[in-house]
């Protein structure tokens, strides 16, 4: 970027290896470990690396990083320190993959600083928030349903569950990247079509 002045696409697989290497070097140097055994300089080292991956007037660097989450705990110091430097995160939980939903992306835990009304537009932003609210309510209801059953839920909660399940299936349309898992050929769905689909599911236009 600084010498040849190109725009660079950088893949890091896996950023957790950088943390592990720092931890091992720190142990060899005899430094006192901090939380969960990580090096005391974890925040400084991660900041130094991530801040070099930035856009300047000379060129830009777009970085895509795979982040291993130990014990599926996002509060672990290694992933937590990494996430603090990222503009967007895509969370791939085992639970969704086990349900056969591909690509197994969790819309609730995934984040993006670009999902703002002045960037994506009011319509897109409002629809995304509506989808997340429905999925969040569904998540809250799952424990109750597991104990009492869906039939004991209120009519409103049953509708929420039905719509949330439609949303989950809608998010698992036959994508090209999922062909190997689903056996279904991939299909391209434009963003306006996707937003329109959610706008039909959320108010109940497809309940029947």
From Swiss-Prot:
It catalyses: ATP + H2O + 4 H(+)(in) = ADP + phosphate + 5 H(+)(out). GO terms for biological process: proton motive force-driven mitochondrial ATP synthesis. PROSITE patterns: ATPASE_ALPHA_BETA. It is an enzyme of class 7 (translocase). Keywords: ATP synthesis, ATP-binding, CF(1), Chloroplast, Hydrogen ion transport, Ion transport, Membrane, Nucleotide-binding, Plastid, Thylakoid, Translocase, Transport. One of its GO terms (molecular function) is ATP binding. It is a peripheral membrane protein. It is found in: Plastid, Chloroplast thylakoid membrane. Its main location: plastid. One of its GO terms (cellular component) is chloroplast thylakoid membrane. Its EC number is 7.1.2.2. Pfam families: ATP-synt_ab, ATP-synt_VA_C. Produces ATP from ADP in the presence of a proton gradient across the membrane. The catalytic sites are hosted primarily by the beta subunits. F-type ATPases have 2 components, CF(1) - the catalytic core - and CF(0) - the membrane proton channel. CF(1) has five subunits: alpha(3), beta(3), gamma(1), delta(1), epsilon(1). CF(0) has four main subunits: a(1), b(1), b'(1) and c(9-12). Belongs to the ATPase alpha/beta chains family. This is ATP synthase subunit beta, chloroplastic. The gene is atpB.
């Amino acid at each position: 970027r600084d010498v040849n002045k190109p725009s660079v696409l950088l893949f890091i697989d896996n950023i957790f290896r950088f943390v592990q290497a720092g931890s091992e070097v720190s142990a060899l140097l005899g430094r006192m470990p901090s939380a969960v055994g990580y090096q005391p300089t974890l925040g400084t080292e991660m900041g130094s690396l991530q801040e070099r991956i930035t856009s300047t007037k000379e060129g830009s660097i777009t970085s895509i990083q795979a982040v291993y989450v130990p014990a599926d705990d996002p509060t672990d110091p290694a992933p937590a320190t990494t996430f603090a430097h990222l503009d967007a995160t895509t969370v791939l939980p085992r639970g969704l993959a086990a349900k056969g939903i591909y690509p197994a992306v969790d819309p609730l835990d995934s984040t993006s600083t670009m999902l703002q009304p002045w960037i994506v537009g009011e319509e897109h932003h409002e629809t995304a928030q509506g989808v997340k609210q429905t999925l969040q309510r569904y998540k809250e209801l799952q424990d109750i349903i597991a104990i009492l059953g869906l039939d004991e839920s209120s009519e409103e909660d049953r509708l929420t569950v039905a719509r949330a399940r439609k949303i989950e299936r809608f998010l698992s349309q036959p994508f090209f990247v999922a062909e190997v898992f689903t056996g279904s050929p991939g299909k391209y769905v434009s963003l306006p079509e996707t937003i329109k689909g959610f706008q039909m599911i959320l108010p109940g236009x497809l309940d029947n």
